[in-house]
Amino acid sequence: MALTVETKKRPEGSKPKALRRSGFIPANLYGHNGRESISLVVDAKVVERLLKAAAVKKTEIELNIPELEWTGKTVLQEVQIHPAKGTPYHISFLATAKG
């Protein structure tokens, strides 16, 4: 089963706390072979479904960023969980192939 996640580029100057209140989780896409990282936002409901279906550093995820016309294979590199609430706080994707 292939997992596909659609993300948006994070708006310049946006505060992570405000994004979370709006129902988005901040995320980063780290490049393959030293490419620059990209700041993203993912819908919180999509993140919850993703975490139920994917294992960190094991499950391949097709990531789609329409604003940048980028689609590629990634793995979930890291998930930060809020210590008190137990909800996802930040996620990191690692590109596994050139996108």
UniProtKB/Swiss-Prot annotation:
Single Gene Ontology BP term?
A: translation
**Which InterPro entries does this chain map to?**
Rbsml_bL25/Gln-tRNA_synth_N (IPR020056), Ribosomal_bL25/Gln-tRNA_synth (IPR011035), Ribosomal_bL25_short (IPR020055), Ribosomal_L25_dom (IPR029751)
> Would the keyword RNA-binding be found if you checked this record's keyword annotation?
yes
Q: Does the keyword Metal-binding apply?
A: no
Q: Which UniProt keywords apply?
A: Ribonucleoprotein, Ribosomal protein, RNA-binding, rRNA-binding
Q: Which GO terms describe its molecular function?
A: 5S rRNA binding; structural constituent of ribosome
Q: Which SUPFAM superfamilies match?
A: Ribosomal protein L25-like
Disulphides: none
Report one GO cellular component. Answer: ribosome
Q: Which family does it belong to?
A: Belongs to the bacterial ribosomal protein bL25 family.
Q: What does this protein do?
A: This is one of the proteins that binds to the 5S RNA in the ribosome where it forms part of the central protuberance.
Q: How does it assemble?
A: Part of the 50S ribosomal subunit; part of the 5S rRNA/L5/L18/L25 subcomplex. Contacts the 5S rRNA. Binds to the 5S rRNA independently of L5 and L18.
Q: What is this protein called?
A: Large ribosomal subunit protein bL25
- Gene encoding this polypeptide? rplY
